[in-house]
Structure formats: C-alpha cells, structure tokens
Regions:
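Glycine-rich beta-strand-centered segment in the early N-terminal region that forms part
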Residues: 21-38, 48-89
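A structural motif shared across PLP-dependent enzymes of the aminotransferase-like
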Residues: 89-102
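Glycine-rich phosphate-binding loop and adjacent beta-alpha segment
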Residues: 90, 208-271, 280, 303-304
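Mid-domain Rossmann-like dinucleotide-binding core that forms the NAD(H)/NADP(H) cofactor-binding site
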Residues: 117-189
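A short acidic, Gly/Pro-enriched loop at the edge of an enzyme's catalytic core
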Residues: 197-204
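C-terminal capping/lid region of NAD(P)-dependent oxidoreductase domains
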Residues: 269-273, 287-304
C-alpha cells in the first residue's frame, strides 16, 4: 500500500511517501481503506521525537481517519463507512489502509464527507472530553479558550456555547470573525493584548497553546476555578495558586465519544471547521503549515 512514513526523528523533510506492507488485522480488528486522514499537532510532535511515546521505524503517523471497511468483524461489515482515532504508538492513518480495533471505530454519518469526519474525529473527541468530562463545564459559566482558530479550540468554542457557557477566546485579529462564527462571545488578539490584563475571574480555561500561556492562565481563574491543558505534556502542570485546579484531560478513544462528536455536528450544535486539504504525498508540507501554528481550522490529507 502507499503510505507516508518516517525512518528517523526530525523535521518535515524526514517524511517519505512510498510503499509499505499492507496491515494484517489481529483479533477484534477490522481493516479500513482510508479515504481521508487529518493532521494534528500530535503527528508532527511524534515525528520530531517530542511526543513521549517511542515508536518503531519506519513509522506511519496520523491519528484520525475516515474510510470504508474492507475486512469486517463483529460490528462492521465490508463496505461500511466508518471513522475513528488510532492508538498511540501503533501505526497511524497516513496510509491507504489501517487495521484497527472495532471499539474505537464508529459509523460515518451519511451527510458528512470523509474529509469532514477525519477533521472532527480527534479534535472533537479532545474537546468533548476536555469540556464535558474534565472541566465539567456548566451552563452560565465563563470559559477562556486559548488558540481559538485551531481544530480542538474551535470545536471547544462551539461546544461551550452549545452547553450554555460564556466563551472568551484568544486568536489573531485576522481570525476574530471566524471564532465569533464558531460561537465566541469575545475574542482577544493575543498578538497585541495581554489576556491577563483584560480577563479575570473566569470559571474555566482550556489551554491548547502551552508554554507560559498555561502558567499565566492560572492568574485569570476565580477561586475554585479549573484549568485543563492539552499542550503541557502527559501530566497536568502544578498550579501557581492553591485555590484552583490544574487538570490534564484523559482523551479516551472509544465509540461512544466518537458518536457524541458526530451527533454534535450532524445536529448542527457544532459547526464544521474550515478545512484545507493536501494530497497524502504532500504530508510534509502539511506538517510545515501545522507547525507554523497559525492555521484556521483543520488540515486534511486526501488518501483516496
């Protein structure tokens, strides 16, 4: 099969496009012919050796996908359209085929394209787990979402609005219209404004940026507030205050959460993100764009 893979850690240039062996399914697995795979920060962090989970070389990256079952199992039959999120550090979705456990695969909604399903799988899953399971965001609360134009943050903005929260987000000025359309009540230009000077006493923060943004965000929480970060490594950072909580979402890859993501989109509670597509053979260029961290929405690789 054709795939994009890397034989060593490094920059985007280490990604190769070529032939790899077809996957051999194990017990409880199905084989999926991938039509689309999305690009996530986790992909280039793994390629750069920054992810924490060791991989064997050559390694196929890619965490989420959408496609058609070619070898069925107990829950899915040949020809079923499905989408899902891969397990780390197993082989990923930058390939024409993947063998994957059935419990982490869900049926693709008929009114969504493969590119759209690939775009919402991991981003939506992360947002749902972060807001509903980890932060337990409630109606009437105020949340600050960092990096609002990104895939996870964009889904989180829309979900928070759907849950009845007041939503503040940070984004470049050029993306303010975009994040407002997603549901943000207020947008702050992080390039010209220090958010700690204009935000205070919020109930929750979702940090998708990391670095000093994480630690500075503790300043704007109310007493008893909570911060969830998906950008600070495998564990939550120690809070800079004793009266707030620091949390690290445990993003569970399972069918119920994938079905929740799909339902939010198909029921129009959450809009689809802006999508930029690249052919699978141009995954290296997609990684360069993703690493630039100025993307609006999601990058998707066309596999078929």
């Amino acid at each position: 099969m054709k795939a994009c893979f890397f034989r060593r850690y490094g920059g985007p240039e280490v990604l190769e496009y070529g032939e790899m062996p077809d996957p051999q399914p194990g017990s409880g697995e199905v084989v999926v012919r991938i039509h689309a795979a999305s690009v996530n920060a986790a992909d280039w962090k793994m390629r750069a050796g920054q992810y924490g989970a060791a991989v064997s070389f050559p390694h196929i990256p890619g965490r989420d996908f959408s496609g058609v079952v070619t070898k069925g199992g107990a829950d899915f039959s040949e020809g079923d359209e499905v989408f899902g999120v891969c397990e780390v550090p197993r082989e990923g979705a930058y390939a024409q085929k993947i063998a994957i456990r059935e419990p982490i695969v869900a049926r693709k909604p008929k009114d969504l394209t493969h590119a759209q399903c690939a775009a919402i799988a991991l981003a939506g899953l992360t947002a749902v787990v972060s807001l509903e399971d980890t932060l337990k965001l409630e109606r009437g609360e105020t949340i600050l979402v960092h990096g609002g134009a990104g895939g996870v943050a964009g889904f989180a903005i829309a979900l928070a609005r759907h849950l009845g929260a007041q939503v503040i987000t940070t984004a470049s000025a050029s993306n303010h219209d975009y994040v407002r359309k997603l549901g943000a009540h207020r947008a702050i230009d992080y390039q010209s404004t220090d958010f700690t000077k204009v935000v205070n006493n919020v109930d929750a923060v979702l940090d998708t940026v990391g670095g000093d943004v994480t630690m500075r965000s503790f300043q704007v929480l109310r007493p008893g507030g909570r911060l969830a970060t998906i950008a600070a490594g495998p564990t939550a950072p120690e809070a800079s205050r004793s009266d707030v909580r620091s949390l690290r979402p445990n993003v569970r890859r399972d069918r119920p959460h994938l079905e929740r993501v799909a339902a939010l989109v198909t029921q129009r509670a959450v809009p689809l993100p802006a999508i930029v597509e690249y052919p699978l053979a141009e995954a290296a260029e997609a990684h360069r764009v993703s690493e630039g961290r100025h993307l609006r929405g999601k990058l998707v690789l066309r596999v078929l």
